[in-house]
């Protein structure tokens, strides 16, 4: 009986731990997000996205921020701003850009900047008891209204029907903004009084549940930890984090880093970065670049805001050099998506975050197990920091090797930032061009895996099968001493392996083709199959 009790307790603990693991973030959601919250029209959103695409800066999604509806959260498009919403959504769909819509959980009687003041659903919400605090209106940052009681199942079902009006093909989720924070420290709900903090998961969980049920590739962008109110969304029901709001100066960047690190330590899987902040002070040239470089080493680069959406937030506004740097950051981040995705799947299965080993003091962190970066947060490009205490680390740019825990003191030109790869790394990539130097256009459509040999290295990769959350496991092992590279996966795939720091290569067996670059000490192997046994001599 005692053994049975211990087994039961053990199972309950495991279930509890599993329930706190973050969800899998769809592969597409790691892509660059443009955020239009300035002009707030269809033309403005199109101009923003097209501005990037015309300059060969990839965009994966666009946030349509408020006011896009006739009153907040009535889910009726304001056709004076967006004359043909379906046409706009299809326009973005034709460019493979997904649409995300802003919302909060409040229904207003007075609005700040919408076409109408009172929502056409306000009276219904109050009369049916769908609001918290007995349906009494309260002033919040977008006017005055009542907040939906997400503890009330009937209210949630009604809310979902409202969402159905706009959650159509091409719309992939929501920027779930903060409204509940303004409705009091203690709230009256359908299940009794509770603190504001206790109420928040009901709101964010409801939005997550609706979204992924309607579209398994859908996301909510929501606050994990924020200095504006603490923890918000549930760890297990938030697939993209945004800690907002921040200023665009050094102070804002430093504060955002602290927020992101706090979120990661809590176990949020995919904290992203609000590049150049959202409000108050605007980024100058140096601040914008350092923001982008830090952002590309988080889950997502989310760029836009009211502090210069069509000026300081645009890389080309700062000059051609910044445009080139920003393009590099976005493309590098895109190339890393299979690695980011695989790391977040690990976090989903075992707990943890994409961002690991974060140091508040040195403003540094690991991206997964194999990459390390340090943010530059001042106009002084000279930085001092320590590499992680475990493993040998390799400078991403020049291949210089460093012992564990090494102190790095270096001046970084604007186009460079501290980035290191752990020896023994096995990095799945999606390389489509030669922009970053990791590969070239011949790798399009292939599973590219980069290996930094260090004794015997093995990694179970979770490779995305498309844009969503589906993946296939692929076990990769490389033995530096024997020169054997083994791969085991469920289906046959076209692979390109890039092995770094290879002093010499004379022969490679059991592959379609191989090429050795003696100057770069780099070996490229092209091969196809599900079970591979490659010999390198």
Regions found by a protein language model. Name each.
Residues 1-19:
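Bacterial Sec-dependent N-terminal signal peptides
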Residues 18-416:
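Catalytic-domain carbohydrate-binding cleft regions of carbohydrate-active enzymes
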Residues 379, 413, 468-472, 491-493, ...:
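Residues that act as N-cap/strand-start positions at coil-to-secondary-structure junctions
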Residues 386-398, 498-513:
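Solvent-exposed beta-hairpin/edge-strand motifs
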Residues 388-389, 488-493, 526-532:
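Secondary-structure transition/turn motif
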Residues 405-451, 518-537:
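C-terminal beta-strand-rich structural cap/linker in extracellular carbohydrate-active enzymes
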Residues 423-511:
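Accessory, solvent-exposed terminal regions and/or long lumenal/extracellular loops of proteins
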Residues 481-489, 515-528:
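Generic recognition of long tandem-repeat/solenoid scaffolds
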């Amino acid at each position: 009986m005692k053994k049975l009790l211990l087994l039961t307790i053990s199972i309950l603990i495991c279930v509890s731990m599993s329930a706190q693991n973050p969800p899998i973030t769809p592969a597409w959601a790691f892509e660059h997000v443009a955020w239009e919250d300035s002009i707030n029209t269809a033309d403005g959103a199109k101009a923003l996205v097209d501005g990037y695409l015309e300059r060969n800066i990839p965009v994966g999604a666009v946030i349509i921020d408020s006011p896009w509806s006739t009153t907040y959260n009535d889910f009726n498009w304001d056709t004076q701003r967006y004359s043909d919403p379906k046409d706009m959504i299809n326009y973005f769909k034709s460019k493979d850009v997904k649409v995300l819509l802003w919302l909060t959980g409040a229904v207003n009687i007075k609005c700040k900047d919408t076409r109408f003041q009172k929502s056409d659903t306000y009276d219904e919400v109050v009369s049916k008891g769908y609001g918290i605090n007995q349906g009494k209106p309260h002033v919040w940052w977008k006017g005055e209204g009542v907040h939906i009681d997400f503890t009330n199942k009937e209210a949630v079902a009604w809310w979902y029907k409202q969402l159905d009006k706009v959650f159509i093909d091409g719309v992939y989720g929501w920027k779930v903004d903060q409204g509940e924070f303004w409705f009091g420290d203690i709230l009256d709900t359908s299940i009794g009084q509770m603190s504001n903090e206790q109420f928040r998961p009901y709101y964010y969980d409801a939005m997550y549940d609706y979204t992924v049920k309607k579209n398994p590739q859908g996301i909510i962008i929501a606050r994990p930890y924020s200095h504006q109110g603490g923890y918000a969304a549930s760890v297990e029901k938030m697939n993209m984090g945004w800690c907002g709001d921040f200023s665009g100066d050094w102070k804002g960047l430093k504060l955002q880093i602290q927020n992101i690190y706090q979120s990661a330590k809590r176990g949020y899987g995919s904290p992203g970065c609000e590049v150049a902040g959202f409000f108050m002070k605007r980024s100058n040239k140096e601040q914008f670049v350092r923001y982008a470089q830090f952002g590309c080493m988080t889950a997502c680069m989310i760029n836009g805001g009211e502090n210069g959406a069509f000026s300081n937030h645009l890389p080309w506004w700062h000059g051609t050099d910044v445009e080139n740097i920003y393009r590099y950051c976005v493309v590098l981040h895109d190339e890393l998506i299979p690695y980011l995705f695989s790391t977040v799947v690990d976090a989903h299965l075992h707990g943890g975050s994409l961002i690991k080993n974060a140091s508040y003091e040195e403003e540094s962190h690991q991206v997964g197990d194999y990459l390390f970066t340090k943010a530059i947060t001042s106009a002084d490009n000279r930085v001092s920091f320590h590499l992680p205490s475990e493993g040998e680390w390799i400078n991403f740019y020049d291949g210089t090797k460093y012992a564990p825990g090494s102190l790095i003191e270096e001046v970084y030109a604007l186009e460079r930032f501290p980035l290191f790869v752990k020896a023994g790394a096995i990095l799945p990539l999606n390389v489509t061009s030669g922009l970053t130097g990791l590969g070239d256009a011949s790798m399009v459509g292939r599973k590219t895996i980069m290996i930094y040999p260090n004794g015997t290295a093995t990694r179970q990769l979770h490779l995305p099968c498309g844009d969503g959350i589906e993946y296939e496991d692929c076990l990769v092992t490389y033995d530096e001493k024997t020169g054997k590279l083994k791969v085991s996966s469920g289906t046959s795939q076209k692979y390109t392996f890039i092995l770094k720091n290879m002093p010499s290569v004379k022969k490679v067996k059991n592959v379609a083709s191989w090429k050795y670059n003696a100057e770069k000490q780099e070996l490229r192997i092209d091969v196809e199959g599900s079970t591979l046994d490659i010999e390198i001599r």
